[in-house]
Amino acid sequence: MSAQKPGLHPRNRHHSRYDLATLCQVNPELKQFLTLTPAGEQSVDFANPLAVKALNKALLAHFYAVANWDIPDGFLCPPVPGRADYIHHLADLLAEASGTIPANASILDIGVGANCIYPLIGVHEYGWRFTGSETSSQALSSAQAIISANPGLNRAIRLRRQKESGAIFNGIIHKNEQYDATLCNPPFHDSAAAARAGSECKRRNLGLNKDDALNFGGQQQELWCEGGEVTFIKKMIEESKGFAKQVMWFTSLVSRGENLPPLYRALTDVGAVKVVKKEMAQGQKQSRFIAWTFMNDEQRRRFVNRQR
């Protein structure tokens, strides 16, 4: 039986339920993590981070031609369908300037992570070129290992270490570089305690107790920052003004709708010419990203058609 997942982008490859038989052929280690639902249907043990990692390996190999993918223990293991949705909606945003999705777009991923997930999907789906920034040397090493282990990715994805504490674009966007868009999945929580509480909530939702030796994944820089998501994105907005002519669209995920008003005020303060909100849904989970530009319609058309 094939059930539609509500709300996924039309081009998302994950509308149907996972074909577990095929995915287990792609990655045989997934078999040990299969379980039966109360209805008697096969599923994956999503409470086990090793199961989620095995599922991701299979999905990335089967749908995105990433034959070799792994991340160190303790790092975020992202749900692939939701990450793909951001990429597809971003493609629609880039298409508005010329009517077609640019095949050679240059994208900056702020906080590429150990998993390198957005570049992997974007390169396969649209042939885009990516620059990924990261503060963690361990995450950067993991992402580089993924790139090096898969033929062709070295030409499409480059990585840069953010060495300046608190900086986002400064030190990453070089003097004469131009990007069609930036993307970011910002730290969500405002403290380590809040991050721990979030993990505890996940445990409860999965019916687990504190003694279950689980690591849902996430290093400090992935899960929390001083002031949380709003402070991080406001800093991004503030810095973006300095790169107004080098980047067509700045974008960021926003986890909670109630965080939008202060961000809209910050965008007004820096003089953003256009602001767009893209709503997304993966199953029961609602999410969104905001996008802003300092270029008018004609400037964006010229930017898309520039020599590369």
From Swiss-Prot:
Its EC number is 2.1.1.181. One of its GO terms (biological process) is rRNA base methylation. It is found in: Cytoplasm. It is an enzyme of class 2 (transferase). GO terms for molecular function: 23S rRNA (adenine(1618)-N(6))-methyltransferase activity. InterPro entries: METTL16/RlmF, rRNA_lsu_MeTfrase_F, SAM-dependent_MTases_sf. It catalyses: adenosine(1618) in 23S rRNA + S-adenosyl-L-methionine = N(6)-methyladenosine(1618) in 23S rRNA + S-adenosyl-L-homocysteine + H(+). Its main location: cytoplasm. GO terms for cellular component: cytoplasm. It holds the Pfam family Methyltransf_10. Keywords: Cytoplasm, Methyltransferase, rRNA processing, S-adenosyl-L-methionine, Transferase. PANTHER family: RNA N6-ADENOSINE-METHYLTRANSFERASE METTL16 (PTHR13393:SF0), SAM-DEPENDENT METHYLTRANSFERASE (PTHR13393). NCBIfam families: PRK11727.1. Belongs to the methyltransferase superfamily. METTL16/RlmF family. HAMAP family: 23SrRNA_methyltr_F. Specifically methylates the adenine in position 1618 of 23S rRNA. This is Ribosomal RNA large subunit methyltransferase F. The lineage of its organism: Bacteria, Pseudomonadati, Pseudomonadota, Gammaproteobacteria, Enterobacterales.
